Structure formats: structure tokens, C-alpha cells
Amino acid sequence: MLQIEIDNGSGFCFGVTTAIKKAEEELAKGTKLYCLGDIVHNSMEVERLTKKGLITINHEQMRELHDVKVLLRAHGEPPETYELARRNNIEIIDATCPVVLALQRRIKTQYEKGRQSSYMITSKGNTTVDDPSKLRPLTGGEDTTSSSSVSLPPAVGEGQTLSASSSIVIFGKNGHAEVLGLVGQTHSHAIVIEKFEDVKALDFTHDIYLYSQTTKSLDEFHKIIDYIQRHISPDAKFQSFDTICRQVANRMPNISTFAARHDLILFVAGRKSSNGKVLFHECLSVNPNSHQVESADEIDMNWFNGVETVGICGATSTPKWLMEECRDEILRHTK
């Protein structure tokens, strides 16, 4: 008989759990509640909460709202969103993850320090930007439910830096809601690098302050740190801040062990989940017989021919009930 194990370590992280709890509490009161962007990168969970009354909006739609309640999800938001809420008399239900919130504050503090240094340099007659013509208007967004009309940060190598002598660099997914919120703390002056190869285009004659999106790969982050340390100018300062969520980082070794002990891995996660992409890649590297699905409807029963054990796991945005639903679907067809 086919043996199926659901990974105990999979499921919502603390930040997502808190956001969903806050949404459900408001909806239980009969409150009309809007959420700025998908509350979690999982279409099934979004659909469940939509049926309860949660209304998902983007930034353009928020501009048209007045005198309502809007929930900010765990990913966080840039300062402009709070200012918009103030102008439109919108009550914010802030579910920003504490880890993300702490990271936003650290980046903002570093940015303010850089501005003060920049002002001191300018007062002595020097310019604060290497080439002002390189400062371009930033437009666009990747996550259309969350970043409509929100400025994308500059890509690496475009010359947009904190000051003449320092750069705030964020290792993260360009256009991701969390990254937009982080870059917003610097008035879009931070530089975003998405992958290890991007680090090579940085200006190593500048001081570099390196941070990471909370859900990125710890191994790749360390590779970036090592590269910068080897190439930074002797006259420049380099500081890195390990801002990757430990609940996320610890999932990597745990999911590797889990994936290795089963004939087949069914990885359940929304395809928009950055964390999901990282974890599924880890499953594949350990167990090539790994398959990703968003729901039970995507399961191909032919996958289980000749298989004795199945491990079901997921991202920090995957609800436990969805993994259980996938397990039940498999059992219905394999008895």
C-alpha cells in the first residue's frame, strides 16, 4: 500500500499565519475588508478568503478608496502606501511580518545615515550623485495585484546609488512586494540584485551595505558576500547584514532530508511564491522525482506507478489543509 507522509515543517510561516488571522478576525465582525495584493502567494487560500468576503485590490484601486479598512499583508509596504492611507482616511490593518518590519527599519536607518554623509560631502562642494542623468523615473511592477503603479527599484549597474560614496544593495526579486517595500525606505535609491551573476556589475569603489529579501537562499547570499569581500576596493567599506528569515533558512536542510527519504515528492505551492521556487529547487536537487502542483487538480496519477512512499511538502505560503487535500486525492485513486 502506498505510504504518504506530510512534512510537519511545511506550511504557513508566522508572518502569513498572523496576516490570515487578522483578516479572518475582521471578516468575522462583518467588516468590509480590502487587502492590498494577494494576502499569500497561494491561489487556493486567496480563493478561500475571497469567499469569506476579503476583497483583493492593487495600488491603483486603493487610490480610489476612502474611509475603508485595508489590510497590509506580511510582505510589507513602502512609506508611500501609508501616506496614501492617511490622505484618503483609510484605516490600515497592518500585518507586516515583524522580520520584514525590522529589515525595513534597518535599511531606512542606513539610508538616513548615508543622506547625512552625502549632505556633508555636498556642503564641501562635491556632488552627491556620480551622474545625475542616470537617475531615471522608475515605472512598472511584477506582481500586478500588489505593485500596480509602484516604482520598480533600479537594476544593478544603472548607476543609481545612495550617495557619491555608498550603495545600499538588496539581494532579492525585482518587483516582489517585499522588495518594493524595502526599496521604498530609500526613495528608490537602493540597488537590487536578483542572482549571483548580478553582483559583478556593482561599483566596488563605493561603500556597499548589503541586505537580503527575507525569503532568499542563504547559500547564494553567502556567495554574494564572498565575491564582494574579494573585490571591494581597499578604500571602500563593506558591511553585510544577514536578514534572511531563520524560519525560511531552516527549511532548506529540513526539506532536503525529507525529500531524500521518499520515492516521490509532491511539492504544493503557488507558482508566484519566491520561497516556493527556492524550496522546490532544493527538492529537485535531492530527489529528481519531485513534482510541483498548486492544487489537487494538477496531480497526475501516473506519477505514482511503481512508487511506494510519497512525501508531501510545501512553501511557507502553503496551507496545511491544501497538502491534506492533495494527500486525500492521491489515496482516492490509489486504493
Set out the residue ranges of the language-model regions.
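Intrinsic disorder/low-complexity segments
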Residues: 115-165
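The feature marks the mature, well-folded catalytic cores of soluble enzymes
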Residues: 1-117, 124-127, 161-335
